[in-house]
Every structure is written in structure tokens, then in C-alpha cells.
């Protein structure tokens, strides 16, 4: 069983987290196109862990590969603190939410990079309006065949994870009626959504090669499914989630993804696994998740009936109960139950707006929640540590 123990050398199921933050002016609460000014000093401190995105009002960070959720916690706290500190040098703040409540994509500057301008040239307004912010979680894989087997099974759980992560109810100053409007916006891109199934890694590789040969893509990174085998990292990458506003929400989601993959792998090894469902059926649940979040019902296709999304979260926690202690993530996984009780970021944003009728108040609350659990002095300590080792 050493393959399941994070403390053993052959543990395969590492995790890494990527987050995309908004750069916000605390006076106007609007997005600010300022990544260029943040990037240079940021790379001095964070090196390859900070990246630009297509819009200059977005900054992306990524953790190092972590064996445990405790390691990931330290990384996320450090990264949020560092980016917040870099932004504060320019009197700016960061926000973790899937969309900005009112800033317009038509007023955002594009990062001066040939790659991004090529994307805009090809995708036009679909690219320009991609002012959205997600959380991606990479789970290490023993090999490519296992990655495909686990992707086929884990597709089913993507709508549940989306419902738990919703943080984008507003778009262009309007309540969209969706808990995750980010996922609606992203659906305008090709090769997005729930992935199809593949019988083997070689079948998947032939699919990618066909797209390359026919000029659709230049490599597998332009396959943007909600769950994909990463073409370079050797991971299975969950891409379905809105960015989590609170650190605890981020860690709960990441820990759950790792635990689910380990659970599915144990079932795979024991020759017992979940039924693999059609993409068309899973898409029904995804639409419900992005529309209603945890307040809606998802379809249990095994039982052929609707079930409250909140009840299904309890089932997820029960499903992974026998692996979380080994992974050291019981506290983080059980935080899902607090999300069920208190609501997601989208729910809180809607409550603030209902109380204030002011989208700026929504941004104010997001700025506070983004830094919840991040020590105020962590950034300066990190700067000093990096300087001492540079």
C-alpha cells in the first residue's frame, strides 16, 4: 500500500494548485491592467511560480508539486501573501473570484506577447471576453494509462466540484442568475467542457496528434477540458472550478480532488470502479451546477433520480473516508461540509449585494475574504527569505 502513502518515495499522487487572481484598485474597485509592473519583481521573489495571463489584470501563480495538503497550504498562503504584497507596492489589491462583479472586458489591456495576440487573432471576442479566473489542480499519475482510466471515471464528479467552487454570479455589473458564469464564458472556446472517454492512452495520443496534424492545435495544452491529462507534467488536471475565494475553500477542493483520485485508483486496483457515463449525461449535471450551485439538484444517474447537491457532497465525504487519514487531509476534506452549511463564494457575494445593493461592497468583501488566513507579515518574511538564498 506504499503507493498510497505520501511519506513513501514511490507515492505518485502529488498535487499542485494554480490560481488566477484579479488585480484590483481599492479606490474604484475596478480591475487594473498592472501585471507587467508586478511581474518583474515577482519573478525575483517567486521565479517560475508567477505568470502573466492574456489580460493584464490577471496574475497566475502555481504551487510546487506537493505530497500533502499541508504542504499545499503553506504554498498557497505564501503565494497569496507574496502577490498581495507585490500589488500593495502599487496601492493595488488582489481578489480571488471567478469573475469581477462589474469591470468590463472591453476596457482591459492584452499582455504584449505574441502568443496571446495569436489567440486573440484566432478567437476574436471569445478571447477578449475571457476575463475569468479559475483554479486548476494537478494530481500526479503513475503512468499515462492510469491517467486515462482515472479521467474516464472522474469526469462524473466534475459538476459536483464546480457546484462547490462557484464564485462568479456577476458579470458586467449584472446578476447573471448563474452561480458560475465563468464556466458559461469559457464554453465559447473550443475543446472545453466535460472530456470524452478514451479506451487507452494511445487512443488519446492519436486524437491529439490528429488535431496537431490538421492545424487545430500546436500541442495538447490547447485542449481545455474540465479534466485533462496534462501534456507535459504527467498529471491529471482538474480545470472545472471557479477560483476559490478563501484559502480554506481552495484547500478543501484540492484535498478532495486528491482523495477522490486515490480512492478511484484503489478501486481500479481492486477491479471495482464506478460506471463510466456519457458526456451528454454529465453535461446535464454541469449545467445545473453552473446555474444553481449547491442550491440545486444533480442527477444521480445510477439511481436515475434527482438528488439535492448538498446531499451529494455528504456522499463524496463518505466515499473518501477510508483514504483521507492516510493522505493527512481529513480536516480539509470535511471543510466541504462547512461550504454546504455556509454557502460558496457566489452565495456570499449575492448575500452582500442583497444587503447593500452595491457591487463595490461585494468587491470589498472579496478583498477581505481573499486574504483570510494569510498572515499580514508573511510577504515580508518571504521576501527576506528569498533574498537570503538568491
UniProtKB/Swiss-Prot annotation:
One of its GO terms (molecular function) is ligase activity, forming carbon-nitrogen bonds. It comes from the Bacteria. It catalyses: L-cysteine + L-glutamate + ATP = gamma-L-glutamyl-L-cysteine + ADP + phosphate + H(+). Gene3D superfamilies: 3.30.590.20. Pfam families: GCS2. Keywords: ATP-binding, Ligase, Nucleotide-binding. Its EC number is 6.3.2.2. InterPro entries: GCL_type2/YbdK_subfam, GCS2, Gln_synth/guanido_kin_cat_dom, YbdK. GO terms for biological process: modified amino acid biosynthetic process. Transmembrane segments: none annotated. Belongs to the glutamate--cysteine ligase type 2 family. YbdK subfamily. ATP-dependent carboxylate-amine ligase which exhibits weak glutamate--cysteine ligase activity. This is Putative glutamate--cysteine ligase 2. It comes from Chloroflexus aurantiacus (strain ATCC 29366 / DSM 635 / J-10-fl).
